[in-house]
């Protein structure tokens, strides 16, 4: 198994519910280390740039509006198969379809307000981690 890094965002709905610590506990219980973290209130420009891959999709405006609606917690996670582990922890995009015990089943309200974002592949993980944590402020341990 390879040690990977992935990006995770705890979205405004989950931050507002005060479940950051519960989500972090799940990362750590799965063997993932938080190697960089920050709480930010994304600007519209940052959200549009980060989600630019979805620009032509009908949900783009609503996604950006949601992501700028309140603060988010952004973290880089590291561990064996970190991308797949994080995606398993998150559950299906639609919380109604997510397995019990996943972050989205437990904390998300809808497919739009779905609590968390996670990178879907090594290539996107590298781009996403670099977007929010450029330079040397990621710390392996």
From Swiss-Prot:
Give a Pfam family name. NDK
Q: Which InterPro entries match?
A: NDK-like_dom, NDK-like_dom_sf, Nucleoside_diP_kinase, Nucleoside_diP_kinase_AS
Cofactors? Mg(2+)
Query: Binding of ATP: at which residues?
Result: 11, 59, 87, 93, 104, 114
Which residues participate directly in catalysis? 117 (pros-phosphohistidine intermediate)
Cellular component annotations (GO), alphabetically ordered: cytoplasm
What does it do?
Major role in the synthesis of nucleoside triphosphates other than ATP. The ATP gamma phosphate is transferred to the NDP beta phosphate via a ping-pong mechanism, using a phosphorylated active-site intermediate.
Recorded protein name is Nucleoside diphosphate kinase
């Amino acid at each position: 198994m390879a040690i990977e890094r992935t990006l995770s965002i705890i979205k405004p709905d989950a931050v507002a519910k005060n479940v950051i610590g519960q989500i972090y506990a799940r990362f750590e219980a799965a063997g993932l280390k938080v190697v960089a973290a920050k709480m930010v209130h994304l600007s519209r420009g940052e959200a549009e740039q980060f989600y630019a891959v979805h620009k032509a999709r009908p949900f783009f405006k609503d996604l950006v509006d949601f992501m700028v609606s309140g603060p988010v917690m952004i973290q880089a996670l590291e561990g064996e198969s970190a991308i797949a582990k994080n995606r398993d922890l998150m559950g299906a995009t639609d919380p109604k379809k997510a397995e019990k015990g996943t972050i989205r089943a437990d904390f998300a309200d809808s497919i739009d307000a779905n609590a968390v974002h996670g990178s879907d592949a090594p290539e996107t993980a590298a781009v996403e981690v670099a977007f929010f944590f450029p330079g040397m402020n990621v710390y392996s341990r």
